């Protein structure tokens, strides 16, 4: 058999593009996305000759190694080694009524946000659509789930999705496809630091997914201190694109705001944020800073987080606080940095997983 990297990635294909004739394509799609098959030999209702032909030409996995690090709160950080040796991460977050995965779209990230460990890594490369999808499929396999049991996807891991839009759109289309993962568009959230051109493009694609803007400051001066690349895209320009997205899709937009001590946590900044969002169907998601080794910033104390939230609510802005999950294994928001937690805690994968 050819080495994995020499084979073609079958996860790049929409169900109607899969190899085979007619109903054989539907069978393959069912094995991939409903049953979560990780080897063509598992597809027992396909003729043996077809299974062998598929295995000679296509690969099912984009990873050479998968490591899992469980948190005390039930979430699990996954560290994936890609076929070229580069690495990326994703997080599984089980809740009482839903199962969520946080997926990466890049190796590293070019945005360089000061509060984010991923940004400190710099940019490695874009992930392919297959590499984005396989994070979800591998997590489902490891958790003993059908891929279709994971009903919430947030593209909030490593990377800026709108700077890898071609691959992200392809992956999202497969997620939404009725013969693939069959996700509801409202269950898919794409997070961006604010790339106006990408937001307009996303609106025109009209996939109906949710948009989350990593704003982190209500004014350009403060935002440039937090996000080095913010000088390229003034807040006014970003907000114009966001308002267009809302008008086009009728989807409420989430604004993510990581609170940093003495930087963006003053109550006057809460009032300025409320003014900025006036007239827009918006929800503010306040994120307490999750510490990481070498971080140049500090988080706002809990009392300050609560006060900022109360001020926004007083001004009529729907607001919630995203308290951390997975912080003990470096899986919380802003902590993904390709680091193995200490002490090392490996969750064994089923035999053959990640191959």
Curated annotation (Swiss-Prot):
Molecular function GO labels: 4 iron, 4 sulfur cluster binding; metal ion binding; rRNA (adenine(2503)-C2-)-methyltransferase activity; rRNA binding; tRNA (adenine(37)-C2)-methyltransferase activity; tRNA binding
InterPro entries: Aldolase_TIM, Elp3/MiaA/NifB-like_rSAM, Methyltransferase_A, RlmN_N, RNA_MTrfase_RlmN, rRNA_lsu_MTrfase_RlmN/Cfr, rSAM
Residues at which S-adenosyl-L-methionine binds: 159-160, 191, 214-216, 290
Family assignment from sequence similarity: Belongs to the radical SAM superfamily. RlmN family.
Keywords, sorted A to Z: 4Fe-4S, Cytoplasm, Disulfide bond, Iron, Iron-sulfur, Metal-binding, Methyltransferase, rRNA processing, S-adenosyl-L-methionine, Transferase, tRNA processing
Function: Specifically methylates position 2 of adenine 2503 in 23S rRNA and position 2 of adenine 37 in tRNAs.
NCBIfam families reported in the protein's UniProt record: rRNA_mod_RlmN (TIGR00048)
One GO CC annotation: cytoplasm
Gene Ontology biological process: rRNA base methylation; tRNA methylation
One Pfam short name: Radical_SAM
Cysteines joined through disulfide linkages: 102-333
PANTHER family in the record: 23S RRNA METHYLTRANSFERASE, RADICAL SAM CORE DOMAIN-CONTAINING PROTEIN
Domain Radical SAM core: 95-322
Main location: cytoplasm
Residue positions binding [4Fe-4S] cluster: 109, 113, 116
Name the record gives this protein: Probable dual-specificity RNA methyltransferase RlmN
Its EC number(s): 2.1.1.192
Active site positions: 89 (proton acceptor), 333 (s-methylcysteine intermediate)
